[in-house]
A protein has these predicted regions:
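Helicase motor interdomain insertion/brace
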Residues: 3-15, 33-192, 196-197
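Conserved RecA-like helicase motor-core motifs
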Residues: 5, 199-215
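Conserved helicase ATPase core of P-loop NTP-dependent helicases/translocases
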Residues: 209-239
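SF2 helicase motor core recognition
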Residues: 238-251, 272-274
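Conserved RecA-like helicase motor core of SF1/SF2 enzymes
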Residues: 248-269
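Conserved segment of the helicase C-terminal RecA-like domain
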Residues: 274-297
Length: 369
């Protein structure tokens, strides 16, 4: 029979490999000026939601999220198919609501400059025939665009990132920093901001796809960028989700998550970009009472559930007892480090010698209750 052992970072058997990883969560309050800019958008959003609720297209609930908007769009489409003329008006309102919802989330979690980029792109799409002009013509949106033209960035995340990065690189001039964000507009603006600081050499790392005037990176460009980061030509890489997996992204001394991600797996992958062979830190940025906070809680719950399921799996021993491993099976595996690939057999023999009796006698791990 074969055992599946579940290890946490503080397990004694892992102490020889333990590398210090400090995780810091920063909960940031939105400034009053930004909250005031959001208020008219929120009021209009709530009015439209109330209208759709009265018409039966939107669920009656306090918080309306992306899924509720998608279901309302489906409800409007069904009404149109059934020749209910109200469906046409509902579909138009829902389309505007979707864009307003995105706009408000961008202002709350990314900042005013990213929101402005979203509106400018909507204007470009409107000229190409996309149905964005109606949303842009809304008085609340028009007034917001006028206000944004006269304002510098208001969101506290960007200056905090600049402070974290410069502190890290001043303390470790040879250090590397990896910043993750969901939005390419945020990538662009963070690179611009960080490069105004003398110790920082920042650049972008994004996916292949192109969207309008925003061009993606080819695989050749991605690999070249990673090599620049690895060699120290650049010391800060600002990446979208493409940097989470699949590519050999070098380890970083500091990882900054510009916003939480709803997937526990993705959060673990991002954290795993630091503290591989030496100490590192992770900083998670959360705008208080926004989508950030809900997403962060959801990700934490997912991670807790993953651990509980693994504990259950171990306890139930849901492994194929009849499966027999060939004694030479280890020859098919290797242990990959940052510098070399070691045959699994050789690695295990070396570790048994290094740990001595503890490695031989350690046959079962105590599971958490």
């Amino acid at each position: 029979a074969h055992n599946l052992d579940l290890c946490k970072r503080n397990e004694p058997l892992l102490s020889a490999y333990d590398v210090d990883m400090k995780i810091h969560t920063h909960v940031l309050d939105l400034p009053d000026t930004l909250t005031a800019l959001l208020a008219p958008l929120r009021a209009h959003f709530d009015e439209e939601v109330a209208h759709l609720q009265r018409q039966g297209f939107m669920p009656t609930k306090e918080y309306i999220g992306t899924n509720d908007i998608e279901r309302a769009q489906q409800s409007a489409s069904r009404a149109i198919q059934q020749r209910d003329m109200r469906g046409y008006d509902a579909a138009r309102r829902v389309a505007d609501l979707r864009r307003l919802h995105i706009l408000m989330n961008l202002m709350q979690t990314q900042g005013t400059s990213v929101a402005q980029a979203f509106l400018n792109r909507a204007e470009e799409e409107g000229r190409r025939g996309r149905k964005t002009n109606r949303m842009l013509a809304l008085p609340v949106v028009h007034q917001l665009r006028l206000a944004l033209n006269d304002l510098d960035e208001l969101h506290p995340k960007a200056p905090l990132v600049a402070s974290l990065v410069t502190q890290e690189l001043n303390a470790k001039p040879e250090g590397k920093v990896l910043i993750f964000t969901e939005y390419r507009d945020s990538v662009e603006r963070l690179v611009q901001l960080l490069n105004t600081h003398g110790s920082v050499k920042a650049d972008a790392f994004i996916g292949h796809s192109s969207r309008g005037s925003q061009k993606g990176m080819t695989q050749k460009q991605q690999l070249a960028q990673l090599n620049r980061f690895r060699s120290g030509e650049i010391n800060v890489l600002v990446a979208t989700s493409v940097g989470e997996e699949g590519l050999d992204v070098p380890a970083a001394d500091l990882v900054v998550l510009y916003e939480p991600v709803p997937s526990a797996v993705r959060a673990i992958q991002r954290r795993g970009r630091t503290a591989r062979q030496r100490a590192g830190s992770v900083h998670v940025l959360i705008a208080r009472n926004t989508r950030d906070a809900y997403v962060h809680k959801a990700s934490e719950r997912q991670e807790e559930n993953m651990h509980r399921l693994m504990v259950k799996l171990v306890r139930q021993k849901q492994l194929n007892e009849a499966y027999v491993v060939d004694e030479d099976a280890l020859e098919s595996f290797a242990v990959q480090t940052d510098t070399e690939s070691v045959e699994a057999k050789v690695f295990l023999e070396a570790e048994i010698l290094r740990h001595g009796p503890a490695a031989v006698s350690y046959t079962h791990l105590t599971l958490p209750t």
